[in-house]
From Swiss-Prot:
Cross-referenced CDD domains: CysRS_core
Protein name in the entry: Cysteine--tRNA ligase
UniProt record, GO biological process: cysteinyl-tRNA aminoacylation
Gene this protein is translated from: cysS
Residues spanned by motif 'KMSKS' region: 262-266
Binding residues for ATP: K265
EC number: 6.1.1.16
Length: 441
């Protein structure tokens, strides 16, 4: 399988029996928005496919439950920080459930790893990769000037001269980032450097270091907005401690816009995932994300939502048609697949998750199924139905062409047809409502 690596700017092969993956989780001070769902569904799609190929995946994700934004939200709502994090962690977990996400093997709130964070930062100081200034600890960028900026293709001097960083007198270099913040605001923790809180950029580096025992992981994923400075700073800390890359492949997905505009509170177009899922089926969002190469920007609008609805409706309509065929005809269903369809699916997925080509394959297969069902060519029909359902399931979509008909459903459908032929329309209408609820009409 090939995936595009942000660091080397080329596709890299990944052919292993065990694959280790890390993805940055949310800061739980608010509901996540639908843009945050893109990397979640991207990794879910990748992991589901890898596991369908018999590959073991170890998937780790963090939860940032210590942050200035959490403190500010607690003050705004006159609540404790724990009340804020409990509320939004619960909402996030419900979002994952509603999206039918394959849960990470480990989902770790960073507040559970303070002592480990303390030791990690202490190691950086001992290696002279970080320095302590009156209880504030900063990473020393200049010690790694040959490496820093490679992931985001940025040069240190350009960043400084462009006035894009805040100048602090206590830092050796204005780009030096905080790995331990001295503060008395909000919940604080004891450390070798005094009371304070760990820096955001150090969380992920620590978890990868600990969970994967200092080894380079296979895939690190996240949105393009995290590429700099967050991922750049993660990478440099791991290099400082171990002298090697934190990840073999960096997978970054593109930005998401709503009706051509970036989501922002000032424009009033921010859509939380909770609100989206209250109005639309989770398959709608999955289908939308599958339409576009994951590295490209994606614009969500009413037309795209309508296209997703039409795709789902095609599946549902065909499912009804197939159920009726099963009731009215005697034949033995095959459990086999159309080998060419499955082959093409795997080719597209292994080519840097080319899901837009997979959707084209699904559309073509739906046309074939519709044609074969009309012709009643049952052997080929069910080869294609089985293949379609396999792909839909592997992509994490909950829709499928239902090929199971119970005796009750069969008897009810035949009774309905008999009553219609007898023109007892009132009774037929009652049965029709039941058949609609069962997905037969």
């Amino acid at each position: 399988m090939k995936l595009f690596d942000t660091l080397t700017q080329e596709q890299k092969n990944i052919n292993k029996e065990v694959i280790n993956i890390y993805s940055c989780g949310p800061t739980i001070y608010d509901y996540i928005h639908i843009g945050n769902a893109r990397p979640i569904i991207l990794m879910d799609t990748l992991i589901r496919f890898l596991e369908s190929e018999g590959i073991k995946v170890n998937f780790l994700q963090n939860i940032t439950d210590i942050d200035d934004k959490i403190i500010e939200k607690a003050i705004q709502e006159n609540k404790t920080e724990k009340e804020i994090t409990d509320k939004y962690l619960s909402a996030f977990l419900q979002n994952l459930k509603d999206l039918k996400i394959r849960m990470p093997d480990k989902l770790i709130p960073i507040s559970e790893k303070i002592s480990e964070m303390n030791l990690f930062i202490d190691d950086l100081v001992k290696l002279e990769a970080a320095y302590n200034v009156d209880g504030d600890v900063y990473f020393d960028i200049q010690k790694f000037s040959d490496e820093y900026g490679k992931l985001s293709n940025k040069k240190i001097n350009d960043l400084i001269s462009g006035n894009r960083v805040e100048i602090e007198d206590k830092k050796n270099n204005p780009l030096d980032f905080s790995v331990w913040k001295k503060t008395e605001k909000g919940i604080t923790f004891d450390s070798n450097f005094g009371k304070g809180r760990p820096g955001w950029h150090t969380e992920c580096a620590l978890l990868i270091d600990e969970y994967f025992k200092g080894e380079t992981i296979d895939i690190h994923s996240g949105g393009i907005d995290l590429q700099f400075p967050h991922h750049e700073n993660e990478r440099i800390q791991f290099i400082a401690k171990h002298g090697k890359e934190i990840s073999d492949i960096w997978v970054h997905n593109g930005h998401l816009t709503i009706n051509g505009e970036k989501m922002s509170k000032s424009l009033g177009n921010t859509m939380t995932l909770t609100n989206f899922l209250a109005n639309y089926n989770s398959d709608i969002l999955r289908w939308i994300f599958l339409t576009t190469y994951y590295k490209q920007p994606l614009n969500i609008n009413d037309d795209l939502i309508e296209q997703a609805n039409k795709f789902i409706q095609k599946i549902n309509n065909l499912s009804k048609k197939i159920k009726q065929l099963l009731i009215e005809n005697k034949f033995v269903k095959t459990n086999q697949f159309d080998e060419e369809i499955i082959k093409q699916f795997k080719i597209h997925m292994k080519n840097d998750l080319n899901t837009s080509r997979v959707l084209t394959l699904l559309e073509d297969t739906l046309k074939d199924i519709n044609k074969l069902s009309t012709l009643k060519e049952f052997d080929d029909l069910f080869l294609k139905i089985n293949s379609l359902n396999y792909i839909l399931k592997t992509l994490g979509l909950s829709i499928n062409i239902n090929t199971f008909v119970s005796d009750e459903e069969q008897n009810l459908f035949l009774l309905w047809k008999k009553i219609v032929s007898e023109k007892d329309f009132e009774k037929a209408d009652e049965i029709r409502k039941v058949l609609i609820s069962k997905g037969i009409l």
